[in-house]
């Protein structure tokens, strides 16, 4: 998807291809390690890049397109439509409201989407997990403690993830916190949580935190992704927990699919009913693919006994056998850069494009073109 958008080279240049991925007990003891999990030689190798840096790259590319304009400081107040157009009512930089009118409105305004709320009120089907996650970006020498580029630490009470973010030693540490804790309580307890979870049991003077952000974990989807001339995509349309990276990847897939539909309409190769197909297909992908797989990923990390997971979890057992079975390793290398990494490798090939869909196949002429 990034290659098709013309941004992959810049993403590769700014980020890095990670090496090993380790599953560990909460105290850091390795359970199983996947070496060169990206894999580094693949043209589709996993690339690590902080989301704010990715945003800057996408913005710079958008500025080069004469058909795109970017307005900062716009707060969406409401949306509306008639038979010929759709519009957004915005308050720009705290000023008076103004109307921005277009043929279509695409709400990509995140989990708290005002576009979605304007369409459906507070209705957002699904659930919120009991635990909350505290995401931090921190400088701390995890290398000195034998940690790999990606570390998933499995424990019902102390699950967390430690992942290298940048080449200069910035790491993402995201850990479990009781969902009943207030923001003040989360911040007050943070030093003790770090001392408990991190190798070496560091004090605050031993690390440098750039930011800390607690947030709730959800599995939710809007009732519809299309209402007339107004569409929803990405977090505005659906939410999932972050294990497996299906939230961001699913958002990209939504954007690709919706753009194919709108391009088809613009070119006269599809009528507005193609947007019903977008709604139908993307919602089905969420409920049949994104939601169950991300849920399974999270349950593996948050409910498994790390002492017995290799015996009881077939996916983890498969990862462990890769060191001895070259065929399993070859299959893993072929598919592991895709988001549905935790699907059983035996059935992974049939799910590899499960989050994608080619909407050009619904054009009135032509056979359509693949979405990647």
Curated annotation (Swiss-Prot):
UniProt GO MF annotations: FAD binding; oxidoreductase activity, acting on paired donors, with incorporation or reduction of molecular oxygen, NAD(P)H as one donor, and incorporation of one atom of oxygen
Reply yes or no: does the keyword rRNA-binding apply.
no
Q: Which domain of life is it from?
A: Eukaryota
Q: Which UniProt keywords apply?
A: FAD, Flavoprotein, Monooxygenase, Oxidoreductase
Q: To what use is this protein put?
A: Terrein shows anticancer activity on various tumors including cervical carcinoma, ovarian cancer, and head and neck cancer. The secondary metabolite acts as angiogenesis inhibitors through the inhibition of angiogenin secretion. Terrein also has anti-inflammatory activity. It shows an alleviative function of age-related inflammation characterized as an anti-oxidant and might therefore be a useful nutraceutical compound for anti-aging. Terrein may enhance osseointegration by decreasing the level of ROS and has a potentially synergistic effect on osteoblast differentiation.
Q: What happens when the gene is disrupted?
A: Impairs the production of terrein.
Q: In which pathway does it act?
A: Secondary metabolite biosynthesis
Q: Does the keyword DNA damage apply?
A: no
Q: What is its EC number?
A: 1.-.-.-
Q: What induces it?
A: Expression is induced by methionine. Nitrogen starvation induces expression of terC and promotes terrein production during fruit infection, via regulation by areA and atfA. Iron limitation acts as a third independent signal for terrein cluster induction via the iron response regulator hapX. Finally, expression is under the control of the terrein cluster-specific transcription factor terR.
Residues binding FAD? 76, 172-174, 215, 235
Job description of the protein: FAD-dependent monooxygenase; part of the gene cluster that mediates the biosynthesis of terrein, a fungal metabolite with ecological, antimicrobial, antiproliferative, and antioxidative activities. The first step in the pathway is performed by the polyketide synthase terA that produces 4-hydroxy-6-methylpyranon (4-HMP), orsellinic acid (OA), and 2,3-dehydro-6-hydroxymellein (2,3-dehydro-6-HM) by condensing acetyl-CoA with two, three, or four malonyl-CoA units, respectively. 4-HMP and OA are not pathway intermediates, but are rather shunt or side products.
Family as reported in the entry's similarity comment:
Belongs to the PheA/TfdB FAD monooxygenase family.
Query: This chain belongs to which protein, by name?
Result: FAD-dependent monooxygenase terC
């Amino acid at each position: 998807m990034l290659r098709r958008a013309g941004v992959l080279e810049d993403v590769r240049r700014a980020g890095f291809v990670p090496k090993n991925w380790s599953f560990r007990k909460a105290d850091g003891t390795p359970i199983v390690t996947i070496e060169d999990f990206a894999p580094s030689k693949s043209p589709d190798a996993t690339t690590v890049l902080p989301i704010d840096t990715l945003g800057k790259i996408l913005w710079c590319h958008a500025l080069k397109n004469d058909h795109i304009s970017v307005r900062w400081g716009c707060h969406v107040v409401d949306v509306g439509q008639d038979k010929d157009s759709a519009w957004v009512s915005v308050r720009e930089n705290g000023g008076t409201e103004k109307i921005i009118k277009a043929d279509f409105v695409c709400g990509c305004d995140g989990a708290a989407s005002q576009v979605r709320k304007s369409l459906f009120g507070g209705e957002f089907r699904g659930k919120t997990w009991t635990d909350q996650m505290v995401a931090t970006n921190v400088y701390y020498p995890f290398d000195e403690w034998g940690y790999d580029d990606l570390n998933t630490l499995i424990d019902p009470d102390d699950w967390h993830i430690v992942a290298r973010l940048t080449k200069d030693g910035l790491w993402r540490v995201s850990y479990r916190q009781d969902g009943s804790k207030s923001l003040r309580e989360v911040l007050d307890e943070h030093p003790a949580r770090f001392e408990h979870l991190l190798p070496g049991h560091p004090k605050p003077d031993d690390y440098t935190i750039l930011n800390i952000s607690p947030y709730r974990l959800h599995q939710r989807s809007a009732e519809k992704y299309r209402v007339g001339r107004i569409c929803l995509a990405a977090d505005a349309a659906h939410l999932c927990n972050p294990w497996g990276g299906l939230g961001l990847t699913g958002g990209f897939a939504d954007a690709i699919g919706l753009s194919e539909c709108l391009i088809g309409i613009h070119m006269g190769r599809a009528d507005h009913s193609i947007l019903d197909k977008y709604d139908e297909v993307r919602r089905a992908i969420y409920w049949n693919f994104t939601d169950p797989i991300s849920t399974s990923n999270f349950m593996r990390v948050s409910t498994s006994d790390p002492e017995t997971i290799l015996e009881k979890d077939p996916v983890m057992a498969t990862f462990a056998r890769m060191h001895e079975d070259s065929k399993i390793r070859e299959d893993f290398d072929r598919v592991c850069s895709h988001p549905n990494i935790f699907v059983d490798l035996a059935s992974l090939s049939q799910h590899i494009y499960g989050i994608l869909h080619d909407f050009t196949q619904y054009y009135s002429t032509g056979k359509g073109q693949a979405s990647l």
